[in-house]
């Protein structure tokens, strides 16, 4: 039987090396160039088809990656027999039962077995794309609105009076607050002969937990804060425990040890310790391993809880506040975030320290120092009204030896004006202080403050990747104001207050990077909360109005500054004519009254003459630089609104950060 021979040596279906391969697979001996089929004297002739050698196509070169010639040095012409390999001696039988001396060797590597796409990673990418789209939509929208307002204001003078209402709304509201505060002072101090609400002193002193959440604080910062708690006056008869919660185990720049190591090795007195691999369910939904230690710090009992992973300050607050609430309620057979072993362990330590019940939680930051009467003054304030569930102190700038630095003076004036105007109006008039700063607060342990409906379902909400930007902002920033707004919405009868006599000194940013990072969080967090408060149920009318005006003022900040510049130009050109206009004259009087009140804050809010001089020096600086600062903060906040990293304000050593975030347990 004869086989049909190809008509051409230039076949398009396979190369010469492939034909040799096919011969091996069929058990045939490849034809060697120059040898005919009948010249093999060692074997009888067979009826196998004979394939003549085919020359290479023009321009073809032998590939080093060929499966036949891989690993063989020198030229290997098509049709030649493959040499014996030194790597393998695997063989197989020919048709006649004889072993073949042909072999095949390879050095390929197989790719890893993994999914073609990671659902979590793709979801994160989609979330970032959505946030970026929302960010640019917001920027373009605000730029368009402000550009249109500026153009209309310059082009059409007929809309001046409408713009006056828009521009003066915030100033008029602030002037109204000033008048209410003055009238309140006049009624309570003059007409009522210095009447003050009666302090309701309980039969037994209230029992307190002093909460100190930490992250990457230094040895000096920790000892200053703890020592200020020890030095508190007039509360010696109040049973209390210092509750320290450290978020992760990291080192900040210049730190030789982590914050947990500073506390356990150098600051706190040694005591019994215990590790819980399953401590509680964190905000990310996974179980959080914690290390606990109990003992005494300068005579005051403490409970230390060190979290293995960083989950943010809000996670620490949810853990501590919810634990105190369920401890106070003696919760049984209810679903909580806590492992029962950890809950019992900490509860027993509270009882052994004399706290069979907890009335108040006093919160502070690890970079804050309390004045010696701070806690007592907050207790006095919260006793005045049983409806009050939370009190904040007066937060002052810690100048730390640099009494005339620009950053400290500027921020000191900001702090004083905020607390001396809107927060004071909320405390004295509405009873709804919408922000209890975490660096100085006293909160009643109650269903309205620390119940599951407030903490676990709303305050502790962890944003999903497909949530809108507002939800991401509120889930990461401004936890203090968001907590208060949730209380007002769910429990409209509750009130909060401010104790101006309760002084607390806090460290403020001293450079642009840290300052802008902090103000971005404050600006985005507060304005998002104000926006949500417009629509929240249970919010009183005056607070809704304040929130609405705050949102509008923030959105048209460039237009307001442009209008102010135009007003100065009009004054320069037609000053007499402007002053004869009663509308403009009334607006200027309202504006002047607002700034006069802010100036007078320097006479009654500071504690001594040095602080008064610092306030007035900062007031002048703030008056001329705040418009530029506001624009810079607005632009920076908008262009970084999709970045939810804490940046310089929570800076850690890179290697430590990687260790802390192992397993995807990072904050954001």
Swiss-Prot record:
GO terms for biological process: chitin biosynthetic process. The chain crosses the membrane at residues 136-156, 162-182, 522-542, 548-568, 583-603, 615-635. Residues 1-26 have a biased composition (Polar residues). It is a multi-pass membrane protein. One of its GO terms (molecular function) is chitin synthase activity. Glycans are attached at residues 21, 98, 101, 216, 476. It comes from the Eukaryota. Disruption phenotype: Reduces the chitin synthase activity and subsequent chitin content. Leads to enhanced sensitivity to stress agents including acid, salt, and oxidant environments. Reduces the production of deoxinivalenol (DON) and causes much less disease on flowering wheat heads. InterPro entries: Chitin_synth (IPR004835), Nucleotide-diphossugar_trans (IPR029044). Its main location: membrane. It is an enzyme of class 2 (transferase). Polymerizes chitin, a structural polymer of the cell wall and septum, by transferring the sugar moiety of UDP-GlcNAc to the non-reducing end of the growing chitin polymer. Participated in the development of cell wall and plays a critical role in fungal response to environmental stresses. Necessary for pathogenicity and deoxinivalenol (DON) production. This is Chitin synthase 8. The gene is CHS8.
């Amino acid at each position: 039987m004869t086989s049909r021979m190809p008509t051409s040596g230039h076949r398009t279906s396979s190369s010469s090396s492939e034909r040799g391969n096919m011969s091996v697979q069929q058990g045939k001996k490849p034809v060697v160039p120059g040898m005919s089929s009948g010249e093999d004297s060692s074997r009888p002739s067979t009826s196998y088809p004979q394939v003549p050698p085919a020359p290479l196509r023009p321009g073809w070169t032998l590939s080093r990656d060929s499966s036949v010639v891989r690993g063989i040095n020198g030229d290997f012409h098509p049709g030649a027999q493959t040499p014996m390999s030194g790597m393998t001696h695997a063989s197989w039988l020919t048709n006649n039962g004889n072993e073949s001396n042909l072999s095949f060797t390879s050095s390929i590597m197989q790719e890893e077995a993994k999914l073609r796409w990671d659902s979590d990673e793709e979801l994160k990418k989609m979330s970032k794309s959505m946030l970026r789209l929302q960010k640019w939509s917001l920027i373009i929208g605000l730029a368009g609105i402000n550009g249109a307002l500026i153009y209309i204001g310059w082009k059409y003078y007929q809309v001046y009076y409408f713009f006056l209402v828009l521009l003066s709304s915030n100033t008029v509201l602030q002037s109204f607050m000033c008048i209410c505060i003055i009238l309140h002072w006049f009624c309570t101090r003059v007409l009522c002969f210095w009447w003050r609400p009666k302090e309701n002193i309980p039969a037994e002193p209230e029992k307190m937990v002093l909460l100190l959440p930490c992250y990457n604080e230094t040895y000096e910062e920790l000892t200053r804060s703890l020592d200020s708690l020890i030095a508190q006056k007039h509360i010696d008869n109040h049973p209390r425990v210092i509750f320290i919660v450290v978020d992760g185990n990291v080192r900040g720049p210049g730190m030789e040890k982590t914050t947990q190591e500073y506390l356990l090795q150098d600051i706190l007195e040694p005591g019994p310790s215990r590790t819980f691999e399953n401590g509680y369910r964190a905000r990310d939904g996974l179980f959080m391993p914690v290390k606990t230690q109990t003992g005494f710090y300068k005579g005051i009992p403490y409970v230390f809880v060190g979290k293995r992973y960083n989950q943010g300050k809000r996670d620490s607050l949810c853990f501590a506040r919810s634990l105190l609430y369920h401890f106070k309620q003696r919760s049984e057979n209810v679903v909580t975030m806590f492992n029962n072993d950890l809950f019992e362990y900490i509860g027993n330590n509270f009882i052994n320290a004399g706290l069979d019940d907890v009335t108040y939680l006093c919160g502070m930051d690890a970079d804050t120092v309390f004045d010696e009467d701070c806690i007592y003054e907050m207790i006095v304030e919260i006793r005045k009204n049983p409806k009050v569930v939370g009190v904040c102190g007066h937060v002052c700038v810690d100048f730390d030896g640099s009494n005339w630095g620009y950053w400290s003076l500027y921020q000191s004036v900001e702090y004083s004006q905020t607390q001396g105007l809107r927060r004071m109006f909320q405390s004295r008039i509405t009873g709804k202080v919408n922000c209890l700063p975490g660096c100085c607060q006293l909160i009643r342990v109650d269903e309205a403050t620390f119940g599951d409906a407030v903490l676990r379902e709303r305050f502790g909400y962890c944003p999903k990747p497909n949530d809108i930007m507002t939800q991401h902002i509120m889930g990461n920033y401004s936890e203090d104001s968001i907590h208060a707004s949730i209380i007002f919405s769910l429990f409209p009868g509750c009130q909060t207050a401010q104790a101006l006599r309760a002084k607390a000194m806090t460290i403020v940013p001293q450079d642009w990077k840290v300052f802008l990072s902090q103000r971005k969080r404050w600006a985005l967090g507060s304005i998002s909360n104000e926006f949500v408060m417009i629509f929240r149920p249970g919010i009183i009318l005056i607070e809704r109005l304040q929130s609405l005006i705050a949102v509008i003022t923030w959105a048209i900040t460039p237009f307001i500054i442009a209008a102010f510049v135009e007003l100065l130009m009009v004054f320069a050109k037609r000053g007499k004519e402007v002053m004869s206009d009663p509308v403009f004259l009334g607006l200027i009087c309202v504006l002047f009254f607002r700034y006069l009140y802010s100036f007078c804050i320097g006479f009654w809010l500071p504690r001594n003459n040095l602080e008064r001089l610092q306030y007035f020096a900062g007031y002048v600086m703030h008056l001329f630089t705040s418009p530029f600062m506001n624009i810079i903060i607005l632009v920076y906040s908008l262009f970084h609104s999709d970045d939810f990293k804490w940046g310089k304000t929570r800076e850690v050593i890179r290697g430590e950060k990687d260790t802390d975030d192992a397993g995807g347990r990072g904050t954001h």
